[in-house]
């Protein structure tokens, strides 16, 4: 196939998370997928180590999901879920999700189209709940620095990433941020993980007390911070946080958008870290990314109040045209069926040890500060002198260079600043894992050489 060049330069999309100057460059246009690989319009093959955007867990050619979509399209391509009208796939999926999530008993499911919409909905539910209880002042939401919760007005405000706030008048005044629980980056000299967790928990409680517990409605957290760089909770962190939330009658929203459905080696991140949330957001792997769908799981404590209040005022007036879209629900049902049939957590645990150990073997590199991860999620953080306090100059774009070298050798990663995320599909074979580790090593060697050159130029 002849190379297709320049055709899409200056294209018509206002592309997400992309700078304006990039539209003057040829975009990477992906044309097809097969298993753990994607192919661009020139036929070049890439090992997709981020599962698209943390979502294509079953790879790019799971025929059962395609067949589920086709069957539903030929039966009922669309119907809504307003006014007590709905479809069987949405009812079946709601039941299946309630059965699957066992960390804390959930009672109702509300469908959205993305994790962003799910987290946006969570805040509306929390407000509705407190208004119904006669606590209109209890509205503030606490999120964490570096967290990613989505891109809608509310979910972007919850996200603790300053670039997502710039020029958007975010975060809104009802959103508060507490510290990121990244032990390697932020612990004090001599401080153990548990002592670090205690300090962060105490600071969280101080924030609550300073604001007034009667004004704080909920705390939202990813079990493992994904986009921030696969930041694992330090020892006893969630135990301490949950005790404080219970003490002050503050709801816990678990954002399982990245962690849910096996990514960490447990069905949900809440299972791994003994989190007992009041509300849960799921998306991404819910359909293995084959259809846009997300869901909000609501505990009995909250759903009973919402339903009772809706009877008083006439209706629960929140929803989307595509809430519970029958095709998306049919695909999600089939994905969940596959996870159960294939014992997907066992699959992840079988391959994740080699994935984690194979990449962490590069941790001695002079340009790597930390390689961290669990299950099939891992992040590499590039720093100078192996210190979190010694980042490379921004203009060196070390992480971006590493990502470009990976692409050159036929592998796609996510490069954000100087950390690089990987979350491969669960279909990854041992041979493909060997290829992943090999390309990582080649790209790292190139990047080390590049950093040496930049340092010599700086002298």
Swiss-Prot record:
Tissue distribution of the protein: Expressed in placental tissue of immature fruit.
Q: What is its EC number?
A: 2.6.1.119
Q: Which reaction does it catalyse?
A: vanillin + L-alanine = vanillylamine + pyruvate
Top enzyme class, one word, equals transferase
Record's Gene3D superfamilies?
Aspartate Aminotransferase, domain 1 (3.90.1150.10), Type I PLP-dependent aspartate aminotransferase-like (Major domain) (3.40.640.10)
Could you tell me the keywords of this UniProt record? Aminotransferase, Coiled coil, Pyridoxal phosphate, Transferase
Where does this protein hold pyridoxal 5'-phosphate? 115-116, 255, 320-321
- What is the documented function of this protein? Involved in the biosynthesis of capsaicinoids natural products, pungent alkaloids synthesized from phenylpropanoid intermediates in the placental tissue of chili pepper fruit acting as repellant on herbivorous mammals and conferring spiciness to hot peppers. Can transfer an amine from alanine to vanillin, forming vanillylamine and pyruvate.
N6-(pyridoxal phosphate)lysine-modified residues are where?
Answer: 284
GO molecular function per UniProt? adenosylmethionine-8-amino-7-oxononanoate transaminase activity; pyridoxal phosphate binding; transaminase activity
**Which Pfam families does this UniProt record tie to the protein?**
Aminotran_3
Starting at the broadest rank, the lineage of the source organism is:
Eukaryota, Viridiplantae, Streptophyta, Embryophyta, Tracheophyta
Q: Name one GO biological process term.
A: biotin biosynthetic process
Q: Which family does it belong to?
A: Belongs to the class-III pyridoxal-phosphate-dependent aminotransferase family.
Q: Does the keyword Transferase apply?
A: yes
- InterPro entries this protein is in? Aminotrans_3, Aminotrans_3_PPA_site, PyrdxlP-dep_Trfase, PyrdxlP-dep_Trfase_major, PyrdxlP-dep_Trfase_small
Q: What is this protein called?
A: Vanillin aminotransferase
Look up keyword Cell membrane and say if it applies. Answer: no
Coiled-coil stretches are 428-459
């Amino acid at each position: 196939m002849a190379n297709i060049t320049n055709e899409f330069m200056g294209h018509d999309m206002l592309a997400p998370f992309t700078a304006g100057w990039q539209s003057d460059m040829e975009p990477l246009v992906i044309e097809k997928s097969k298993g753990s690989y994607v192919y661009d319009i020139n036929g070049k093959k890439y090992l997709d180590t981020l599962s698209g955007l943390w979502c294509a867990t079953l790879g790019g050619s799971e025929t059962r999901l395609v067949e589920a979509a086709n069957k539903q399209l030929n039966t009922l391509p669309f119907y809504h879920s307003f006014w007590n009208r709905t479809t069987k796939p949405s009812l079946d999926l709601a039941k299946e999700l309630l059965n699957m999530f066992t960390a804390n008993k959930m009672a109702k499911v509300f469908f959205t189209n993305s994790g962003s919409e799910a987290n946006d909905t969570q805040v509306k539910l929390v407000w509705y709940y407190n208004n119904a209880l006669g606590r209109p002042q209890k509205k503030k939401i606490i999120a964490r620095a570096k967290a990613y919760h989505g891109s809608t007005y509310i979910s972007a405000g919850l996200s603790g990433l300053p670039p997502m706030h710039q020029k958007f008048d975010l975060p809104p005044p009802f959103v508060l941020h507490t510290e990121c629980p990244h032990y390697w980056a932020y612990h004090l000299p001599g401080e153990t993980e548990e002592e670090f967790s205690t300090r962060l928990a105490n600071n969280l409680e101080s924030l609550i007390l300073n604001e007034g517990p009667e004004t704080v409605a909920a705390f939202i957290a990813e079990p493992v911070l994904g986009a921030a760089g696969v930041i694992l909770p330090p020892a006893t962190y969630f135990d301490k946080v949950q005790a404080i939330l219970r003490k002050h009658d503050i709801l816990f929203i678990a954002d399982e958008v990245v962690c849910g459905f096996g990514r960490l080696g447990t069905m949900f991140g809440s299972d791994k870290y003994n989190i007992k949330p009041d509300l849960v957001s799921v998306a991404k792997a819910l359909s293995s990314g084959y259809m846009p769908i997300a869901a909000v799981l609501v505990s009995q404590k909250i759903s009973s109040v919402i339903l009772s209040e809706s009877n008083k005022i006439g209706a629960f007036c929140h929803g989307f045209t595509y809430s519970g879209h029958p095709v998306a629900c049919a695909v999600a049902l089939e994905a969940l069926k596959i996870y159960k049939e294939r014992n997907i957590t066992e699959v992840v645990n079988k391959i994740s040890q080699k994935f984690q150990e194979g990449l962490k073997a590069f941790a001695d590199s002079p340009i790597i500060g930390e390689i961290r991860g669990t299950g099939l999620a891992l992040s590499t953080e590039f720093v100078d002198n192996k210190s979190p306090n010694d980042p490379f100059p921004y203009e060196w774009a070390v992480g971006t260079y590493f990502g470009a070298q990976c692409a050159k050798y036929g592998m796609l990663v996510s490069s954000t600043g100087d950390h690089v995320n990987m979350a491969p599909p669960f279909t990854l074979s041992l041979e493909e894992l060997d290829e992943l580790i090999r390309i990582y090593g080649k790209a790292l060697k190139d990047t080390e050489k590049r950093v040496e050159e930049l340092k010599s130029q700086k002298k």
